[in-house]
Curated annotation (Swiss-Prot):
Compartment list: Membrane
Sample GO molecular function, one term: iron ion binding
Name of the gene this protein is made from: lnbC
The protein's name in its UniProt record: Cytochrome P450 monooxygenase lnbC
Keywords from the UniProt entry: Glycoprotein, Heme, Iron, Membrane, Metal-binding, Monooxygenase, Oxidoreductase, Transmembrane, Transmembrane helix
One GO cellular component term noted in the UniProt record for this chain: membrane
Glycosylation sites: 94, 169
């Protein structure tokens, strides 16, 4: 009887039965997530509560951060953006999740789904868990201290000299008559920053400024970042991540692997001179003392990849908002040109004393944070209170950088570029400045913030001391760019005129 019954069942029947069971299971799971899950009382769209699909859709679309910001405008300072995930924008939540020096059992650890290990089980400082992070931070901190960065000023100034010379050449009508003095500034910011970072990491620059073009290794960095974003999105769909991974373009994967291979070769060469004295210490000089080769590889790779593009993004957005806000442009150029009578006076110590320059950079990072996404964490196993509400253990939590820094809850005229808000202007005294934390806070804040500030201040000050910049009709508002962990890159064409100095 049983044999006869089985013989009457076709393969199609089996597939239909299994499909029906699969659909039923996931419908039940979705219903549980919406109506019975411990996070059910938190506000947010029902579809986001039901499954990861809506979140992943916006990640792949390149507007996840803007989507999250829209949700916060609608639902408030905390939003449920996934079945087991909450997004916050309040400074108090930021302090709870990232601030202080909590004991190990109170730590909001990195979300292992969002921060995939780049090299097996080897940790880099960005992905590392509590104990590994403390160890790596101690090894790396001396390389990024204010003292260490001051010792690298000659390197930063030297490459800035090259940048200024190249732009001066291209601003002239005779050398490039077809361009009419219009230059896409984005590649040039990449050239100088990746030259600086590779010089400080490998001992030698990658030579972008020399060739006035992207080195192949740099050109694939942006694809490598998108590859990582797609991979992270795929892992949100576990156990079905293989489906999405199947659609990641092969050339993107190949570029990512080529990027890693070149990094390893450069570090292998640097390690061969480990015992030889160098003219000026670089990052590797510090990190070679206590890291394994694999740890060195992972950490140098993340420093270059994350540090170059984010710093370039802030300088370019500063220039964009300056040329589109004449009063701010005039005030900053006046501050720089009135302070310095000769370009050689523009030192790291001197630019640190320019209040409006610092305010411009702070405002650029507020209105266009270089890392717009929230930094993903997991609530302690025992749970925690965030903004007075109980969050169950192992809940995914984050603070949405873009949403927080543009929220009318914390800022007056949040869409307006106004550096004066950082200088005590009474009109903006209601602003909650802590809502903008582009370098994060606490013991896991950005280790490279001193170097980033040095690069941004020196490069921007010297550009505005040497040149006058004019906006072009095809300029794209940085807020309109897509984001894949960091912002995509699009041309920023500016007309550059060599400054006419008067005595």
């Amino acid at each position: 009887m049983a044999a006869r019954l089985l013989s009457s069942v076709s393969l199609t029947d089996v597939v239909l039965l299994l499909s029906s069971v699969w659909i039923a299971v996931h419908l039940v799971l979705a219903a549980y997530n919406v109506y019975l899950h411990p996070l059910r009382r938190y506000p947010g769209p029902k579809l986001a509560a039901a499954s990861q699909l809506l979140n992943v859709y916006h990640v792949l679309k390149g507007d996840n951060c803007k989507w999250t910001a829209q949700l916060h405008e609608k639902y408030g300072t905390v939003v449920r953006i996934g079945p087991n995930e909450l997004s916050y924008i309040s400074p108090s939540a930021n302090q709870t999740i990232f601030g202080g020096r909590p004991k190990e059992d109170k730590v909001f650890e990195k979300n292992p789904v969002a921060y995939l290990q780049g090299n097996g089980d080897i940790s880099n400082i960005f992905f590392a868990r509590f104990h590994d992070h403390n160890r790596l931070r101690k090894l790396m901190a001396p390389a990024f201290s204010e003292t260490a960065v001051r010792e690298q000023e000659a390197t930063i100034q030297g490459y800035t000299n090259q940048l200024i010379a190249a732009l001066r050449n291209r601003s002239g009508q005779a050398a490039y008559p077809d361009a009419k003095g219009v230059v896409n500034i984005i590649p040039w910011l990449h050239f100088i920053l990746f030259d600086v970072l590779t010089r400080l990491s490998f001992g030698d620059p990658i030579g972008c400024l020399d060739r006035a073009d992207y080195h192949p290794w740099v050109s694939v960095i942006f694809k490598a970042i998108i590859h990582s974003t797609y991979t992270q999105a795929a892992h949100r769909l576990a156990p079905y991540q293989w489906i999405l991974k199947h659609f990641i373009p092969n050339d993107m994967t190949a570029n990512y692997e080529a990027h890693l291979e070149f990094t390893r070769k450069q570090l292998d060469q640097r390690q061969q001179v480990k015992e030889e004295p160098v003219a000026r210490a670089d990052f590797s000089s510090f990190m070679l003392k206590g890291m394994s080769p694999d740890e060195l590889f992972d950490n140098v790779n993340i420093v270059i990849t994350a540090g170059g593009e984010t710093t370039a993004s802030t300088i370019s957005s500063s220039l964009y908002y300056l040329v589109h806000n004449p009063s701010s442009y005039e005030r900053l150029t006046k501050e720089i040109r009135d302070t310095f009578s000769a370009e050689g006076e523009i030192t790291l110590a001197a630019v640190a004393a320019l209040p409006y320059l610092k305010a411009v950079i702070q405002e650029a990072m507020r209105i266009h944070p270089p890392v717009p996404i929230g930094l993903f964490r997991v609530a302690p196993a025992a749970g925690a209170f965030i903004d007075g509400q109980w969050v169950p253990g192992n809940t995914w939590v984050s603070v949405a950088n873009l949403a927080a820094s543009r929220s009318p809850t914390y800022w007056r005229d949040p869409e307006r570029f106004t550096p004066e808000r950082w200088l005590g202007d009474a009109k903006y005294e209601s602003d909650v400045r802590e809502a903008s934390a582009p370098f994060s806070i606490g013991t896991r804040n950005c280790i490279g913030l001193n170097l980033a500030n040095a690069n941004m201040r020196i490069i921007l000050a010297r550009l505005l001391w040497n040149f006058d910049f004019e906006a072009q009709p095809d300029n794209i508002d940085p807020h309109e760019l897509d984001e894949y962990g960091i912002w995509e890159t699009k041309p920023l064409n500016l007309k550059i005129k060599e400054r006419v100095q008067t005595t």
